[in-house]
């Protein structure tokens, strides 16, 4: 889902000159983990800097809301499909009955041999 504000993400600033621990070094090589080193990330709505954990929590909340709406829509469509399947079954029974009656009537009109 694209951000309508057109947020441009710039690469994180270089780490401080202090010597990083071994866990920080492995995290620093990952481009998707700027928050691991404590760098703030820009907020989607206000442009202010927010904690990466807070940003992830916001994204999880947005995803949960979207999934809830999707579940509601899926449930509504499912109910409509069940209703349509029932109607189709009833129509099939009706057509089969008519077919049988027409066949029976046709057979009764045939001359007996």
Swiss-Prot record:
Segments for region (Disordered): 1-46
Any one Gene Ontology cellular component term annotated for this protein: cytosol
Primary location group: cytoplasm
InterPro entries: RCDG1
Keyword Cytoplasm appears in the UniProt entry: yes
Biased composition (Pro residues): 10-19
Subcellular location: Cytoplasm
Keyword annotations from UniProtKB, A to Z: Cytoplasm
Superkingdom in the source lineage: Eukaryota
Regions of compositional bias (Low complexity) in chain numbering: 20-34
Name of this protein: Uncharacterized protein C4orf46 homolog
Record lineage: Eukaryota, Metazoa, Chordata, Craniata, Vertebrata
């Amino acid at each position: 889902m694209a951000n309508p504000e057109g947020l441009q993400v710039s690469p994180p600033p270089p780490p401080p000159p202090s010597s990083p621990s071994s866990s920080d070094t492995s995290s620093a090589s990952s481009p998707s983990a700027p928050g691991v080193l404590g760098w703030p990330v820009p907020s989607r709505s206000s442009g202010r800097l927010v904690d990466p954990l807070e940003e992830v929590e916001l994204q999880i909340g947005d995803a949960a809301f979207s999934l809830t709406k999707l579940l509601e829509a899926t449930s509504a469509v499912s109910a409509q499909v069940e209703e349509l399947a029932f109607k189709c079954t009833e129509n099939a029974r009706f057509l089969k009955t008519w077919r049988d009656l027409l066949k029976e009537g046709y057979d009764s009109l045939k001359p007996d041999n």
